[in-house]
Curated annotation (Swiss-Prot):
One of its GO terms (biological process) is maturation of SSU-rRNA. This is Ribosome-binding factor A. It comes from the Bacteria. One of several proteins that assist in the late maturation steps of the functional core of the 30S ribosomal subunit. Associates with free 30S ribosomal subunits (but not with 30S subunits that are part of 70S ribosomes or polysomes). Required for efficient processing of 16S rRNA. May interact with the 5'-terminal helix region of 16S rRNA. Keywords: Cytoplasm, Ribosome biogenesis. The gene is rbfA. It is found in: Cytoplasm. One of its GO terms (molecular function) is ribosomal small subunit binding. It comes from Halalkalibacterium halodurans (strain ATCC BAA-125 / DSM 18197 / FERM 7344 / JCM 9153 / C-125). Belongs to the RbfA family.
Length: 116
């Protein structure tokens, strides 16, 4: 039962985080951030937020620094928008799955070109 609730809270947090990043945060380091997923623990105490950033590694690190600096504000906004007893602690991670998928797709295209 709690797993279903954690999934619902994660989906709602994903929507709210996207809205917060787009409308509320004015930090130029956090301009090109996309929230790809949110995993909330069963006790709703922690949330792992997976993001992608448009840009190179330097911009990714700057974005992560900006997010960690704004973590308190983001958490308070989540607390205002989602009615929970305690707002989950946020941990930001880069979602490498999109880059990994693009790399595999490129390798498959190279194999197809070599086979022709």
């Amino acid at each position: 039962m709690s797993n279903v609730r954690a999934n619902r809270v994660g989906e709602q947090m994903k929507k709210e985080l996207s809205d917060i990043f787009m409308r509320e945060l004015k930090d130029p380091r956090i301009e090109f951030v996309t929230v790809t997923g949110v995993d909330v623990t069963g006790d709703l105490q922690q949330a792992n937020v997976y993001i992608t950033v448009l840009g190179d590694d330097e911009q990714k690190e700057a974005t992560l620094a900006g997010l960690s600096k704004a973590k308190g504000f983001i958490r308070s906004e989540i607390g205002k928008r989602i009615r929970l007893r305690k707002t989950p602690e946020l941990f930001f991670h880069f979602d490498e799955s999109i880059e990994y998928g693009n790399r595999i797709e490129k390798l498959l295209q190279d194999i197809n070109r070599d086979g022709e």
